[in-house]
Curated annotation (Swiss-Prot):
Localization: Nucleus; Cytoplasm
Organism expressing this protein natively: Emericella nidulans (strain FGSC A4 / ATCC 38163 / CBS 112.46 / NRRL 194 / M139) (Aspergillus nidulans)
Ranges of compositional bias, category Gly residues: 295-311
KO phenotype (gene knockout): Displays partial derepression of activities subject to nitrogen metabolic repression.
Quaternary structure (record): Monomer. Interacts with areA.
Similarity section: Belongs to the NmrA-type oxidoreductase family.
Predominant place of localization: nucleus
GO biological process, alphabetically ordered: negative regulation of DNA-templated transcription; nitrogen catabolite repression of transcription; nitrogen catabolite repression of transcription from RNA polymerase II promoter; regulation of nitrogen utilization
Name used for this protein in its record: Nitrogen metabolite repression protein nmrA
Residue ranges of the region described as Disordered: 287-312
SS bond list: none
UniProt keyword list: Cytoplasm, NAD, NADP, Nucleus, Oxidoreductase, Repressor, Transcription, Transcription regulation
Lineage of the species this protein comes from: Eukaryota, Fungi, Dikarya, Ascomycota, Pezizomycotina
Length: 352
């Protein structure tokens, strides 16, 4: 029997996570009701042309009527809010209330992030901690819910002068990445456009009977900065070097909130070398652990389990995502197949 097609409510539809889900969900016949802040721009125009997708334009802050409309007749919801839209805690709580009020939502997936201050002697990362507050609110409401934690987007890399993930093109044709991350500590990575949608669709297919209340790390690969640069070097056939720096260099105007985010990253990951995901269920052995339990390194890496703080049995951080979606794209493939195309679209010509 064919699976019943359902209606999915989505916010921030032009964002990488939401757009990835919309593309694959609509392609297999689901209907999507999606909020956008503007109908202008390449992604918004793309979404308008996709069958089975209905867009609702408007802000989320203090806009309960739009939220009620968005959830009308929806069976499923994927919610990824951003600080740029306004008070993220207020928006997140209002969305959860609206979903609960609709009475039709069978599974609510919320894109969360950790509050580091709750798990160790570290400050909170300001653009992440509000998401964790909203996660706890959703849990209290009793919505059938799952919480996904996205790794660092591969797609963040650019040779444009944006902070933290600039692959700077040097005069000799090589690239350098300057960031505060420890060069040898693995970080979680995700090709958001390619892999978020299929993974979320599988979570919805499995349903809350499998995933209710569960946290899932949406990361398919853990690589240290040195390993990332090695993957780029192999893909581009150019030397790519990582340089650890204590401070993120700011070359363009950025909002105050993002500047504060970068300052927290310098402290949490640069000075303190804190884990990216400090939650016990995402604990994983550090580099140098016994074979099979160390950081993932490429698609053939083995997997292991360990007991983390509080007795929580922790899967290797990539395991659940890889089981949800086996067609994931690794960093080397991204750097070879996608990075040059994105660069050319941004008006750059180093690859020609």
């Amino acid at each position: 029997m064919a699976q019943q097609k359902k209606t999915i409510a989505v916010v921030n539809a032009t964002g990488r996570q939401a757009a990835s889900l919309i593309r694959v969900a609509a392609a297999v016949g689901h209907h999507v009701r999606a909020q956008v802040h503007s109908l202008k721009g390449l992604i918004a125009e793309e979404l308008q042309a996709i069958p089975n997708v209905t867009l609702f334009q408007g802000p989320l802050l203090n806009n309960v009527p739009l939220m009620d409309t968005l959830f009308e007749g929806a069976h499923l919801a994927f919610i990824n809010t951003t600080s740029q839209a306004g008070d993220e805690i207020a928006i997140g709580k209002d969305l959860a209330d609206a979903a609960k009020r609709a009475g039709t939502i069978q599974h609510y997936i919320y894109s969360s992030m950790p509050d580091h201050s709750l798990y160790g002697p570290w400050p909170a990362v300001p653009m992440w901690a509000p998401k964790f507050t909203v996660e706890n609110y959703v849990r209290q409401l009793g919505l059938p819910s799952t919480f996904v934690y996205a790794g660092i987007y591969n797609n963040n890399f650019t040779s444009l002068p944006y902070p933290l993930f600039q692959m700077e093109l040097m005069p000799d044709g090589t690239f350098e990445w300057h960031a505060p991350f420890d060069p040898d500590i693995p970080l979680p990575w995700l090709d958001a456009e390619h892999d978020v949608g299929p993974a979320l669709l599988q979570i919805f297919k499995d349903g809350p009977q499998k995933w209710n209340g569960h946290r899932i790390a949406l990361t398919f690969e853990t690589l240290s900065p040195v390993q990332v640069c090695a993957a780029f070097s192999r893909a581009l056939n150019r030397r790519v070097t990582y340089v650890q720096v204590p401070k993120v260099e700011i070359k363009v105007n950025i909002p105050v909130g993002y500047r504060e985010q970068l300052e927290a990253i310098e402290v949490v990951f640069g000075e303190h070398k804190a884990p990216y995901f400090p939650l016990p269920e995402f604990s994983r052995p550090a580099a140098g652990s016994p074979k099979g339990l160390g950081p993932a390194n490429g698609k053939g890496a083995g997997a292991g389990m360990m007991q983390g703080p509080g007795g929580v049995i922790s899967q290797r951080v990539t395991d659940e995502a890889r089981k949800l979606w086996s067609g994931w794209r690794d960093m080397e493939e991204y750097a070879r197949e996608v990075f040059p195309i994105e660069e050319e679209a941004n008006g750059l010509d180093w690859m020609l």
